[in-house]
Amino acid sequence: MKVLNKDSKRRDEILGIKEWVDMGGIMRIECITIDQMRELIDNDFLDLEDKQNFAPRIKYIYEFMKKYPDFEAHGYAVSPNRDDYRVSIEGVRLKRKATKEEYKEFRLLFEAADEISAVNGEAGLFCWFD
């Protein structure tokens, strides 16, 4: 496993966390853009080989988001006070109707999600891995 950057103040700044609301040592993050993800990777706050349980590895989610930058990731940040300090990516969402190509690739990459909303209506697309 990659050694992650322990500068939690900088990590939280990238993620837009202004005040830490501790829920058992984690903080939910509802919107991680491709730019934020790139900055987290470039500053060693994300390990591209890491994954949330049965989710695709972060590198595959990152490649997907580079190709389709309107998607946003969601997940949580773990407190630097815990041994398992990290940012975990639990899934992605699209807040608009997907193109046929986006929909097809979303279904392929995230088919094993614990929760998936892939009816390509006005609500967009969503997946979550427990």
Give a label for each model feature.
Residues 1-93, 102:
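Long, contiguous N-terminal structural blocks used for assembly/anchoring
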Residues 97-106:
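Short, conserved charged micro-motifs
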Residues 105-130:
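Acidic, proline/glycine-rich low-complexity IDRs
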